[in-house]
Regions:
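Solvent-exposed, acidic/flexible segments
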Residues: 2-9, 21-28, 83, 99-107, ...
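Flexible, polar/acidic helix-loop-strand segments at domain edges
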Residues: 30-124
Length: 178
């Protein structure tokens, strides 16, 4: 957002009557590194359409992160993704559901990462912390982040949903979706 994370928080708080005080932003490298350090994540389902759409995003992410991740051969159930593939999956926007579905995919990837981290050991958690410190922006101190990471085994993810809860969209000519 123009003005950085602080401006984004101010806008969200003002427009949605929230009281967000802290933030963490991550770049592609952080997602790729975390998923790879966890040994990949497994998703319940990746559709054939999603597998195809991931390819363009994977090309960009491979280039940016200096990786050489391979395309999925197709969709399926219980699909294990590496870091580049998981990041590409989370970026898909142009399917039925548009940006709302993209946000849902992002929540799915994050939940899979947390679940996998909770099954790992403290050595892996420490490697995750070391790997992502250079790839995040946050209002938290390093000590705060270490304390939060140490509690990863106790986290419980509740139900997640997008906003607005009821939504519709349409395409206006070549201008895209609204």
């Amino acid at each position: 957002a123009k003005g950085g994370p602080e401006a984004a928080i101010n806008m969200l708080n003002k427009n949605l009557d929230l009281s967000i005080t802290d933030y963490v932003t991550v770049d592609f490298n952080a997602v790729v590194e975390c998923v790879d350090l966890l040994g990949g994540i497994t998703l319940d389902e990746v559709t054939d359409e999603e597998a195809v759409l991931m390819q363009g995003y994977m090309d960009e992410i491979n280039k940016l992160t200096k990786n050489n991740s391979k395309y999925l051969s197709g969709g399926g159930t219980n699909v294990t993704l590496d870091g580049v593939q998981a990041c590409a999956y989370a970026r898909i926007r142009y399917t039925k559901g548009d940006d709302y579905k993209r946000a849902e995919r992002q929540r799915t990837v994050l939940a899979a990462m947390v679940a996998k981290a909770q099954k790992s050991d403290l050595v892996t958690i420490n490697k995750l912390i070391d790997a992502v410190f250079g790839d995040i922006q946050t209002s938290f101190s390093n000590a705060d982040l270490v304390a939060l990471a140490a509690q990863v085994f106790n986290y419980k993810l509740g139900e997640t949903s997008g906003f607005p809860f009821n939504h519709g969209s349409t395409t206006l000519g070549s201008k895209g979706s609204v």
